[in-house]
């Protein structure tokens, strides 16, 4: 009996240690979630009031697109074309930009008439997942399970960019995946492991090609920094990075190619870069916007939102 009690004690201690190791990651998910819920309560967002989180394009565009999407999924209609857009239009381009996120398929669980509420929940979920993935990156990158990773995960999830753009629900998947992609490229270079990099980058490209373009630009710059740190195997690292980046892009091509063809036939085909370089804003004033306690810019001069 004494032996059994000792074994049980060891098992309980092991479980306790495993639970403690998970606490920072769990906190990185739950703290942004709790703060988001408190904000909803304070602003009387349903079910705590009669308001909703939908604003601007989220209300006038994204919600109708989501409604069309769930109707197609439940009725078995084709995702290639829609008869509810004007006199009829392709649905592929809308799906590729607005609806391709894997999380959006959970809308099948949403009762009819609650699409707005589903989108609000999805927004909060993505904010919370940002905290989790960034904390996970810090844990693996610095080989630590310090509680501080939950703090920095929360800071990432509730950053100024998320505060300003969380309502653009089709963008935030890439923000969730970005820390995992960065961890993946580190593993690709340092450990010759490609699975995480390929899967996360391909998923990001499929989810939203617009933000993925910015992620890819960052990846090239970050890869060059990692390459400088490598003392050997640089050629192999370059080959792996190029190959798996192209492979991820090729995976995303199932949506990128139709999207490019459709955009080429739309009014966007005549758009080109300016022939001359010109400053449209004060650079010092723009840099000043990065400081704390400055007045939030709400004008319509279309200054670049740099974070």
Task: Identify what each model region corresponds to.
Residues 42-142, 147-179, 203, 207, ...:
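Active-site lumenal/periplasmic loops and adjacent helix-entry segments of GT-C-fold
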Residues 44-49, 112, 191, 227-234, ...:
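Transmembrane helix-loop junctions in multipass membrane proteins, especially transporters and channels
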Residues 17-29, 46-53, 206-242, 289-306:
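Alpha-helical transmembrane segments and their immediate interhelical/interface regions
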Residues 56, 60-71, 96, 102, ...:
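Periplasmic/ER-lumenal interhelical loops and adjacent helix-loop junctions
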Residues 1-5, 208, 288:
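Short intrinsically disordered, low-complexity coil segments enriched in acidic
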Residues 1-45, 240:
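Start-transfer (signal-anchor) and selected internal transmembrane alpha helices
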Residues 32, 36, 123-141, 147-228, ...:
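Membrane-embedded helix bundles of polyisoprenyl
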